[in-house]
UniProtKB/Swiss-Prot annotation:
It comes from Porphyridium purpureum. Heterodimer of an alpha and a beta subunit. Dimers further assemble into trimers and the trimers into hexamers. The basic functional unit of phycobiliproteins is a ring-shaped hexamer formed from two back-to-back trimers contacting via the alpha chain subunits. The trimers are composed of alpha/beta subunit heterodimers arranged around a three-fold axis of symmetry. The phycoerythrins also contain a gamma subunit which is located in the center of the hexamer. Keywords: Antenna complex, Bile pigment, Chloroplast, Chromophore, Electron transport, Membrane, Photosynthesis, Phycobilisome, Plastid, Thylakoid, Transport. The keyword Protein transport does not apply. (2R,3E)-phycocyanobilin binds at C84. This is R-phycocyanin-1 subunit alpha. Light-harvesting photosynthetic bile pigment-protein from the phycobiliprotein complex (phycobilisome, PBS). Phycocyanin is the major phycobiliprotein in the PBS rod. Signal peptide: none annotated. Contains one covalently linked phycocyanobilin chromophore.
Length: 162
């Protein structure tokens, strides 16, 4: 799994050298931000159910047809609503994983790689997930560096969903 630290190590190793001062400074910077990232991951995990429920409702409010259209891609039934919440939860989990490792590797490997194909196959609109992620970003209740760390990965998820 790629993280800024593993990438720096891989580059140095491929070139048969020790980490440069610049690379060591980047690694040190990551460790300095790690506490904020772990705090954000813990807070998002602790608030996951509230955030997922609120995000799903934000999607239904902005796109009311999602609760009125029949079919497996819509939330017109309890099963459809459960699928929507499950998918939002998956995005939120990926955000927490990226926070823990300090890089987009988990999201790139487990989410982004097949996202377009999944959305197309199941006729899912990226705008639904963008709305859900915006809700999470605006409602997580984090502040300072903790919020900055979380928001960076939420924004990454939003931008890769486009």
């Amino acid at each position: 799994m790629k993280t800024p630290i593993t990438e720096a190590i891989a580059t140095a190793d491929n070139q048969g050298r020790f980490l440069s001062n610049t690379e060591l400074q980047a690694v040190n910077g990551r460790y300095q931000r790690a506490t904020a990232s772990l705090t954000a991951a813990k807070a998002l995990t602790g608030s996951a159910q509230r955030l997922i429920t609120g995000a799903a409702q934000a999607v239904y409010n902005k796109f009311p047809y999602t609760t009125q259209m029949p079919g497996p891609a819509y939330a017109s039934s309890a099963i459809g609503k459960a699928k929507c919440a499950r998918d939002i939860g998956y995005y939120l989990r990926m955000v927490t994983y990226t926070l823990v490792v300090g890089g987009t590797g988990p999201m790139d490997e487990y989410l982004v790689a097949g996202l377009e194909e999944i959305n197309r196959s199941f006729d899912l609109s990226p705008s639904w997930y963008i709305e859900a992620l915006q809700y999470i970003k605006n409602s997580h209740g984090l502040s300072g560096q903790v919020a900055n760390e979380a928001n960076a990965y939420i924004d990454y998820a939003i931008n890769t969903s486009l």
